[in-house]
Amino acid sequence: MTNIRKSHPLLKIINHSFIDLPTPSNISSWWNFGSLLGVCLMLQIVTGLFLAMHYTSDTSTAFSSVAHICRDVNYGWLIRYMHANGASMFFICLFIHVGRGVYYGSYTFMETWNIGIILMFAVMATAFMGYVLPWGQMSFWGATVITNLLSAVPYIGPALVEWIWGGFSVDKATLTRFFAFHFILPFIIAALAMVHLLFLHETGSNNPSGLNSDSDKIPFHPYYTMKDLLGVILLILALTLLVLFFPDLLGDPDNYTPANPLNTPPHIKPEWYFLFAYAILRSIPNKLGGVLALVLSILILALLPFLHTSKQRSLMFRPITQTLYWILAADLFTLTWIGGQPVEYPFVIIGQLASILYFSIILVFMPISGHIENKILKLE
């Protein structure tokens, strides 16, 4: 008699995805972040559901309802800060996950990679709309500034902005629809994540060497289930430390002031995980150009499979491109720092140089270094 997990229609899917899945024996801890993203998503959906039970998406009561959650709901403060800081952990895992994919050449799995880019846009949209919901100063002005960027779209721009606002400014209609979208998107993300895994399991996982690992596979369970469990424990430990000791470390104090359309905060800036893109947006002194650069800063990931010139997949044995990769990582940290600074000298010029460097490394230097390494190794 066959095992039920191998015969039952539902359990069979789970078995092929998480139990008997043949996995490369040498994947490192950088491969833990996919499962951590799944844990983050589940955590966000659960905490978000409980927050939605007490939140009201009306401009007159939204801010008070969040205060009510923190003051009067049993462990409401915990749920709220788990949700807010859970988003930060989500993005830390997301950036590491994408960075791993770039480093080890995982972008050669085209379908998996492209679904991943769509997932990234969906997560960013969800986080942006979630930031608007508490209806603090930074919520309101962030929503105003970012939605206004759509007015740069030629011909239909202004109509598009008013259509998204549901009026002539960010108001009740905007908040209500943002709440609706913020609620539905995580479920769409969960569905997309399943498609992401479906395509990944068509090809099998990549590994640090970038070589074919068909000859050396081990079952996912118990090896990687245990390894993932350790990652989950560390993630929850980090999140717990953040929530219980430094709940407002990554937030903006301006968001503790109720939204006021008549009073602009001195420095409008998004949450830390958007600062790199915000810095790229601000570094171009033209509205449409800035918006295009903003979108391209993420969409450029879709070009990576076509810019791959090396005969080797991974950067593991490619010191020149490795150096460029870490310069790119440092450049992203620089952009993140600049995005949080006021628009004045010397921050403007640093941001512009960092933005140029970002696109240059990806579009010019990395493809060239791939060719150079091929020549050195006599692969061309």
UniProtKB/Swiss-Prot annotation:
Cofactor: heme b
Molecular function as annotated in GO: metal ion binding; ubiquinol-cytochrome-c reductase activity
Assembly notes: The cytochrome bc1 complex contains 11 subunits: 3 respiratory subunits (MT-CYB, CYC1 and UQCRFS1), 2 core proteins (UQCRC1 and UQCRC2) and 6 low-molecular weight proteins (UQCRH/QCR6, UQCRB/QCR7, UQCRQ/QCR8, UQCR10/QCR9, UQCR11/QCR10 and a cleavage product of UQCRFS1). This cytochrome bc1 complex then forms a dimer.
Record-given protein name: Cytochrome b
Keyword Transferase: no
Binding site for a ubiquinone: 201
Membrane topology, record value: Multi-pass membrane protein
Family under the similarity heading: Belongs to the cytochrome b family.
Cofactor binding note of this UniProt entry: Binds 2 heme b groups non-covalently.
